[in-house]
């Protein structure tokens, strides 16, 4: 398997994290902070979108199961407006 060569792009995006251990050894870890940050950001947005969809779904479901007086009133008014528009057209 070929080793990846360092290009200016990888050199600029890679972050070298050097840690000193108690016994004097130094360990080196390569990180890609930009890609890690981007992935975290995407996951956060996706989870927010999922939560929003669930909330909208449950609100719709709850309004169907136990409609409040206000939601019934708006539904009836919407249907009445649609019905009266069709009457005008016909």
Curated annotation (Swiss-Prot):
Top-rank lineage group of the source organism: Viruses
Biased composition (Polar residues): 1-27
Pfam families per UniProt: PB1-F2
Any one Gene Ontology cellular component term annotated for this protein: host cell mitochondrial inner membrane
Entry annotated with the keyword Membrane: yes
UniProt site (High pathogenicity): 66
Location of the region described as Disordered in the Swiss-Prot/TrEMBL record: 1-32
Coiled-coil blocks: none
Residue ranges, annotated region (Mitochondrial targeting sequence): 65-87
Keyword entries, A-Z: Apoptosis, Host cytoplasm, Host membrane, Host mitochondrion, Host mitochondrion inner membrane, Host nucleus, Host-virus interaction, Inhibition of host innate immune response by virus, Inhibition of host MAVS by virus, Inhibition of host RLR pathway by virus, Membrane, Modulation of host cell apoptosis by virus, Viral immunoevasion
GO biological process: symbiont-mediated perturbation of host apoptosis; symbiont-mediated suppression of host cytoplasmic pattern recognition receptor signaling pathway via inhibition of MAVS activity
Keyword Membrane: yes
Subcellular location: Host mitochondrion inner membrane; Host nucleus; Host cytoplasm, Host cytosol
Assigned protein family: Belongs to the influenza viruses PB1-F2 family.
Subunit organization: Oligomer. Interacts with human SLC25A6/ANT3 and VDAC1. Interacts with host MAVS.
Described purpose of this protein according to its UniProt entry: Plays an important role in promoting lung pathology in both primary viral infection and secondary bacterial infection. Promotes alteration of mitochondrial morphology, dissipation of mitochondrial membrane potential, and cell death. Alternatively, inhibits the production of interferon in the infected cell at the level of host mitochondrial antiviral signaling MAVS. Its level of expression differs greatly depending on which cell type is infected, in a manner that is independent of the levels of expression of other viral proteins. Monocytic cells are more affected than epithelial cells.
Something else known: Is not encoded in all strains, and seems to be dispensable for replication.
Descriptive protein name: Protein PB1-F2
Species this protein is from: Influenza A virus (strain A/Duck/Hong Kong/2986.1/2000 H5N1 genotype C)
Gene that encodes it: PB1
